[in-house]
Structures are given as structure tokens and as C-alpha cells.
């Protein structure tokens, strides 16, 4: 009676739970950045912001302990002739070592080559592979024309500056947010950082989650509330959470960030549900053998009654599954699960192995 359907019901249940729950609030915040400015004989350069970010997933040349220094610059033509500006006009040194420039995940973020007329400006980002917390020098040499070489300008950047280091500390916030969602929704745990990281009201999101879970179970199983009352559904939801919390796990790591999107690599140790349908079926057969006059409705209610305990008995699977999940950032740097992305479903599916 419950064979083949149990697995699909479980997955649809989790998907509906996530869909209803994963919508956080957004508020605006004003950001103010100090500017550093220097001039050559034909150009004025401003460093508007410096931060650490993660290498692009396409950049295979970086080591695991390296980061990317992202420098936002504005260049103004203070000469009389048109000025060509390109990211290649900039070099970065870490000590005496010239560091490699790199491309971001979204190439449009990088300072693009352009020609600007007198008194006009262009702004963009520079990306360099660096070791975190070092001293850097950014050099800008305007493109030369004829025999006269324009003056270069050099900026010193302190990679140990607290403000810059703080950007490195935030690089795993999207991974922490994903783990927090799993904690409070799938595992039924408390997570003290949930609201700070995601911007969602924990009580509201858990209540929405639980109500959606019960509706989702009825919808996916095709059962009416006649068979599954609110108490039975509460027990099923709580049993699933307890079973997942006890016998599954997740390790999350942010692997790339582009603007307001991040890719988090989630390595999931799922529960092994290969025996669940058969075990519930055996329970129902045993029930019928002892209650030969039982109706179909009574048998279904019994199956729903034993479902939570049987689920909690599921052990961890012998293998892990790694999936990529997209997270989206609101305007005050809080990370939320992107339910419009197909990978959210893959994350849910990763928690159970048939």
C-alpha cells in the first residue's frame, strides 16, 4: 500500500516545506566608504573600496588558502587628449612579488577597456590572487603615447586592515546561512545566528514550515484529513526532523561569490531509506493479521502512526552526496536560499537515499 509512494511523498514534503519557508525580509542600509585618491600628469585615480572575495570556480590556478583581492577603482582623464583605460594598466605587488590578475565569475564586474575623453571617468573592479592579510602595492601606469612616458601612481593597501579582513570573515556567511536553514527547518534544531544571517523571523518561518509540511504530506500522498488528522501529521513532521537530525548531516562551504549570488557546496550524508517502504508495509501486514476485520481507513491510520518511529530508525547511508546550492543576498548582507533555482530541489533530494 505504501511501497513506491513513500519516497516520492517524502521528497515532495520536504520541497514544499522549503518553498513555503525560504523567504526572508529585506531592509535597506546605507554604506559609506572612504576614498583614496592620487593623480598622475594625465589621470586621477580613486580607490573606492577594497575587499577580499573568493576565486571564480573557473580559476583552477589558485591554491585552497588563497583569496582574491577585489579593488574598486575610478579613473578620471585629467589630460586634454582621450585616455585609454584598461585593467592591464594596473599591477599588484605582494611584497616584491607581482601577483596574478584573475577574472571574476561575472566578467562584467571587471574594469573593461575603454577610451574616455577629457574630464570623463570610468569605474570598475580589479581582481588579483593574493595571500590574505599581507601588504600590497597597487600600481597604475597610464597608457603611454609617443616618447613621453606618463607618471605612475602607487597605492599601499594594508591587507591586515580590520575593515578589509572583515570582508574575508564574511565569505562563508552564505554557507552558514544554508546550514542554519537546514538546522531550523529539517533538523528541528535551534540556531542562534539564524535571524542575523538570513533576515528571516525564526518562529514565523518554522510555523510556516510545519503547516506547509502537513499540507504537503496530504497533497503528495493523496490522503484526506479523514485519514490523517493534525496530530498524526505533527508526529510525522517531527519524526522526519528527528530522524534527519540524528542520522543525516551536512557540511557547507561557499565556493564562489558573484555580486549578490553565492554558490555553496553542500556535502550531505543522507539517511538510508531503502528499507522504509518495506518496513511500513510489513507493519501494515502484521496489523491486518492481528486485526482481520480492520477497515482500510484503520489500516492507513495505523501506517501513519508507525511512520515516524520507522523513519527515526533509518540509519545513515554509506556514501555522501555533494550538490551545489545557490544563495541570494539581500541589501543588508543576509543570505537566503534561492528556491527558484533547480539546485534547491537537488539539496532536498540529497538528504534521502532510496
Curated annotation (Swiss-Prot):
The keyword Transmembrane does not apply. Pfam families: DUF4352, DUF5105. Keywords: Cell membrane, Lipoprotein, Membrane, Palmitate, Signal. GO terms for cellular component: membrane raft; plasma membrane. The keyword Membrane applies. It is found in: Cell membrane; Membrane raft. A lipid is attached at residue 22 (S-diacylglycerol cysteine). PROSITE patterns: PROKAR_LIPOPROTEIN. Residues 1-21 form the signal peptide. It is a lipid-anchor. Its main location: membrane. A lipid is attached at residue 22 (N-palmitoyl cysteine). InterPro entries: DUF4352 (IPR029051), DUF5105 (IPR031343), Immunoprotect_excell_Ig-like (IPR029050). This is Uncharacterized lipoprotein YcdA. The lineage of its organism: Bacteria, Bacillati, Bacillota, Bacilli, Bacillales.
